[in-house]
Amino acid sequence: MALPPILKDTLRLPIIASPLFIISNPDLVIAQCKAGIVGSFPALNARPEPVLDQWLQRINDELDRHNQENPDSPAAPYAVNQIVHGSNARLEYDMEMCVKYKAPIVITSLGAKEWVNEA
């Protein structure tokens, strides 16, 4: 299976940085993407809920700016890790934010829900 263009055209190394609970934040994700690897973070790191909106806006803005200034070396995409377990009361809101900001990659863990895949 061939890599999709979003990965083929931007990855310098075939790496997804681990979405580290509490540690991963916009600064780390932006640096990872600029370095050519998929930067990632757990949605639950953005607390309280409205902070996720701010994080995604900032990540998109910074990576868009980088890509405009460096057309020959575009940033790799980022990924948002979603906990799909029934105990995650934020899942619906967090997925709305991923859709709003067109998160390039969504990683799921601790369960599966068809509507998350369709988003």
Locations of the language-model features?
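Active-site entrance/lid segments in N-terminal catalytic domains of soluble metabolic enzymes
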Residues: M1-A119
